[in-house]
């Protein structure tokens, strides 16, 4: 549809840059045909039996490393999507010749190559984040329940994954031979698209998930999983990232509770935004505990809650306390990242649909106590990918030129 609308402008396309949401896994057979649907990033099913099996048949190397980091390995084994398939769908596991991410599958369909971007490797994967490559040690693949030869070839951020095949050109309308460029996951390219590629700036993305990320010059870790570190949108850069899975989804949830009072979601947002501006900070004694799903590091068994309700509270009080609760979670994430990295963030950039809320932005600025800005274009994920796509084919001399374009 997009290529049809472009018409003759298609000839001006210089490259195609791929980004996608992360931590989605799908097995493929030897003919590169999917064996099942995706296990997506929101799927938190665990496989504790994998931990017991690894301990039972552990090699000496596995025992040695486990003696140093037993807890980390056990956690990875239990949360690995490969292990879930191995123990719950053994016939699929046996037939799997490859496992791919969403961007890897798109690359396969567009170029015919079993390749994927280094920057897309997020989640419970046998990926060495510090060195930006697959692990070199066989026992790590035992932990995750997958083989090295089942993983796609990694391509650095900003390099060429392949070119559009004849078949893909016919199916999509894209020019045959068009370069397809490796980028990174959606949150990492958001940081780049927002122009934040130093530790001095943090990027908050207010979408279904609420996340806060800081691009680092070296990997920063937290052994308690209070935040994650993923490969950044640029080689030799890393994104320290804190998130709550249910971010501004909570605002949608609140609308569902009052949907009968409004003709549309937009009407609800408009009325609540106006009314919430007259609610004092603290939402008249209400507090939202925003962990409606688990958080591995802070609250692995969390349940969301609204604390302080009385018969005098109104819906705008509840609405404001939701905005405050989400912003307080972002402050909590920023604090732990700054403590681990020993670096102070000077400015916060907010993007995503939630950044369009004036009252939400002011609450965020107040709680984080830093200069806080939003961009004219709140959807900067595609912009970050386009910057890398342009640089790869010479449209931009460097990333800075792309950011300023």
Name the predicted role of every residue range.
Residues 32-34, 120, 234-236:
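Short glycine-enriched loop/turn motifs at secondary-structure junctions
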Residues 1-37, 95, 166-170, 174-179, ...:
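N-terminal glycine/serine-rich phosphate-binding loop of ATP-dependent small-molecule kinases
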Residues 47, 54-72, 76-115, 124-146, ...:
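Active-site core segments that coordinate phosphate-bearing ligands/cofactors
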Residues 7-79:
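Active-site phosphate-binding/coordination module
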